[in-house]
C-alpha cells in the first residue's frame, strides 16, 4: 500500500511503500529551501535527480550529494539539508 506524506507546508512530498527488493522506503521530491529532518531509525538516502547539500550528525562540514550518490543517517538523530533546485530522492529505512 502507498502512503502519501507532506512536510514543510508542501515543499517536501513523499510516497512510502514496501517492496521485496527495497524493503520499507519512500520516494519524494524536495523544493528549494532549508530543512531539518529527524530519524527514528537508520536511513539510507539516494539522490535520484538534483542535488542535496547535507550536514550529517556529528559533522561540521556540509557535503553536496548529486544524482546517484548515497549517504547514511544514524537512527535517533537529525540532519540538515539545503536544496537549491527541486531534488528527488529514495529513502530506505534500515
UniProtKB/Swiss-Prot annotation:
User: One Pfam family from the UniProt entry?
Assistant: Ppnp
Annotated catalysed reactions: a purine D-ribonucleoside + phosphate = a purine nucleobase + alpha-D-ribose 1-phosphate; adenosine + phosphate = alpha-D-ribose 1-phosphate + adenine; cytidine + phosphate = cytosine + alpha-D-ribose 1-phosphate; guanosine + phosphate = alpha-D-ribose 1-phosphate + guanine
Q: Which GO terms describe its molecular function?
A: guanosine phosphorylase activity; purine-nucleoside phosphorylase activity; thymidine phosphorylase activity; uridine phosphorylase activity
| Signal sequence region | none
Arranged from A to Z, the UniProt key words for this protein are: Glycosyltransferase, Transferase
* Group of enzyme by EC: transferase
Listed EC numbers: 2.4.2.1, 2.4.2.2
Give the SUPFAM superfamilies listed for this entry.
Answer: RmlC-like cupins
A GO CC annotation given for this chain: cytosol
Question: Does the entry feature the keyword Transport, yes or no?
Answer: no
Q: Which family does it belong to?
A: Belongs to the nucleoside phosphorylase PpnP family.
Q: Which HAMAP family match?
A: Nucleos_phosphorylase_PpnP
Name of the protein: Pyrimidine/purine nucleoside phosphorylase
Amino acid at each position: 500500500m502507498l502512503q502519501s506524506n507532506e512536510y514543510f507546508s508542501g515543499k517536501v512530498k513523499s510516497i512510502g511503500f514496501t517492496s521485496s527488493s527495497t524493503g520499507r522506503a519512500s520516494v519524494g521530491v524536495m523544493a528549494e529551501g532549508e530543512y531539518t529532518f529527524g530519524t527514528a531509525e537508520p536511513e539510507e538516502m539516494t539522490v535520484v535527480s538534483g542535488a542535496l547539500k547535507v550536514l550529517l550528525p556529528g559533522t561540521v562540514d556540509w557535503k553536496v550529494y548529486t544524482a546517484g550518490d548515497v549517504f547514511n543517517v544514524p537512527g535517533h538523530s537529525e540532519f540538515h539539508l539545503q536544496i537549491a533546485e527541486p531534488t528527488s530522492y529514495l529513502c530506505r529505512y534500515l
